[in-house]
Amino acid sequence: MARDYPLDRYRNFGIMAHIDAGKTTCSERILFYTGKSHNIGEVHDGAATMDWMEQEQERGITITSAATTTFWERTEDGTTADSPKHRLNIIDTPGHVDFTIEVERSLAVLDGAVCVLDANAGVEPQTETVWRQADRYKVPRMVFVNKMDKIGADFFNCVRMIEDRTGARAVPVGIPIGAETELEGLIDLVTMEEWLWQGEDLGASWVKAPIRDSLKDMAEEWRGKMIEAAVEEDDDAMMEYLEGNEPDVPTLRALLRKGTLALHFVPVLGGSAFKNKGVQPLLNAVIDYLPSPLDVVDYMGFKPGDEEETRNIARRADDDMAFAGLAFKIMNDPFVGSLTFTRIYSGTMNKGDTILNATKGKKERVGRMMMMHSNNREEIDEAFAGDIIALAGLKDTTTGDTLCAQNDPVVLETMTFPDPVIEIAVEPKTKNDQEKMSQGLARLAAEDPSFRVETDLESGQTIMKGMGELHLDILVDRLKREFKVEANIGAPQVAYRETISKEAEVTYTHKKQSGGSGQFAEVKMILTPTEPGEGYSFESRIVGGSVPKEYIPGVEKGIKSVMDSGPLAGFPVIDFKVALIDGKFHDVDSSVLAFEIAARMGMREGMKKAGAKLLEPIMKVEVITPEEYTGGIIGDLTSRRGQVSGQEPRGNAIAIDCFVPLANMFGYINTLRSMSSGRAQFTMQFDHYDPVPQNISDEIQAKFA
């Protein structure tokens, strides 16, 4: 079967933003105008199509990235085209900082992105986080300044903030006409026309008009800036422009596209998705400026099993190449079971194919293939390069795995997932639910790599670990709704770490004689602290065979067993290196086990000698508050051992930046609400680990001893 849409007509893009910038509303309008949904879902009614999980509808925030395929034809005349020529695969990503992992996963498989800003708040902390993630994956993007109907909306302030906060060059291509209640439409700077929405058809049609006299000077000024940015992309166009000739409309669009794809600048337009103004120009701009799969550089992968990970195997959007794709999300569907969302980078795939999971080295059979529309699905038999589809029936595939043709294996991407910073103990209310709870937690962990489930070896309790209170709240809620398990949860615990503060040398001898052959091993080791974030390393400096080679893995195993449970309070040990420099063995009584025990006991002694200390996660907190509450809020943050690093005006409020230990931030939202009569808001994300003050460290050790 041939493909319906040529590859240059595909746009795979994500919609990303800070929480409450109106991202989901934007997606909803796109689905409405492209004819995918017949009525508009509103977030504040809990009816948005993209927010399909029950918790998302209740809380009005997006938790999982829903993938949707829809179609659009760029139009000039105020009506939507009958025969759409472009295929849009849209991923709506969450804006809440606890779900950053979802954004990370979707950016890895997108070609472009639309960043939605709140016209009043501008570039907010999570916008910056997402922007940095997009920079890491080199994703070309454009900006839609949304909520231009809001009090305090300021388009040009947002343009300045994009440049100040992200370092990107912002180039407006469409300027809103009016703001707040006066918002009428926008000026298209490329064609120099007004787009106006007035009808009662929910913004589905619009009219074009010449630019009114009162706006001409401003439009000319911004058009000049846009053209200057565009002609920098081409020497001939630059020469023409310097001679007084402006590029025509098709040339201008081509130059703007070239600069956007090269990440030289970011096109910006404004509007209000909620008021149905400015969404069609945004769709046109997606087609004009964001990349098709053909515009993306080759995806370089490495051969499975190559420890060097030499990326010398190329894959590109070409149906004739060998099949390769990336599983970027696992989702449980109540009707179909487990769905694996997959981006196809090269080749084609048919229902019933047997493919290779190159990351795990296992074969998978494709049971069913679906094109997803939020959570409705359309069964398909064949998929092509550039498609984003859902596969049912895969058994061993998890997030970040590469799927490929068996006869031409490749591993494309290794995604990085952050370590959890918060944990809670969880147990089912009835013993009968234990099995159901374990299965449910395992399913949730397969969907979300930033969520871990472990069993506490001493207490036997099940421990849930995640990225924040909201993250764990929602997972407990999903246990109840999706797996029908009522659970009791403990108070949140901080994920402390242990490390050492100075170099130490330790010698430990393990001897055991109990009739017959005994156990004997002696190790001499040097423990050295490393820079924060460097992790752990081990080296053997044994010369002359004082410890035979076959026993050295036992030594490393003993060291690693202490890493999982440090000597102070049983927390994982990080940022240190160990060198094995000498030792002794016995021909009969030595064994791998004896050296493992010697290394373990030696590590425990050595860590005390090396000044073992507790570390705690420090969160980067930003509070945005009306000015009158600033003093009280700063005082409260300081009392939580917070260090205020700065404050600045943000719109008509003040933004306070601060570093605070996570241990002191539990339940902060309630304190903040009561201090500010509900008007302040905050975001926080993990920043680094710091040593715990001695008096608090003593308390923690006493508690966990």
Curated annotation (Swiss-Prot):
InterPro entries: EF-G-like_DII, EFG_II, EFG_III, EFG_III/V, EFG_IV, EFG_V, EFG_V-like, G_TR_CS. It is found in: Cytoplasm. CDD domains: EF-G, EFG_III, EFG_mtEFG1_IV, EFG_mtEFG_C, EFG_mtEFG_II. GO terms for biological process: ribosome disassembly. GTP binds at residues 17-24, 92-96, 146-149. Its main location: cytoplasm. It holds the Pfam family EFG_C. GO terms for cellular component: cytoplasm. Residues 8-294 form the tr-type G domain. Keywords: Cytoplasm, Elongation factor, GTP-binding, Nucleotide-binding, Protein biosynthesis. SUPFAM superfamilies: EF-G C-terminal domain-like, P-loop containing nucleoside triphosphate hydrolases, Ribosomal protein S5 domain 2-like, Translation proteins. The keyword Transmembrane helix does not apply. GO terms for molecular function: GTP binding; GTPase activity; translation elongation factor activity. Catalyzes the GTP-dependent ribosomal translocation step during translation elongation. During this step, the ribosome changes from the pre-translocational (PRE) to the post-translocational (POST) state as the newly formed A-site-bound peptidyl-tRNA and P-site-bound deacylated tRNA move to the P and E sites, respectively. Catalyzes the coordinated movement of the two tRNA molecules, the mRNA and conformational changes in the ribosome. Belongs to the TRAFAC class translation factor GTPase superfamily. Classic translation factor GTPase family. EF-G/EF-2 subfamily. PANTHER family: RIBOSOME-RELEASING FACTOR 2, MITOCHONDRIAL, TRANSLATION ELONGATION FACTOR G-RELATED. This is Elongation factor G. The lineage of its organism: Bacteria, Pseudomonadati, Pseudomonadota, Alphaproteobacteria, Rhodobacterales.
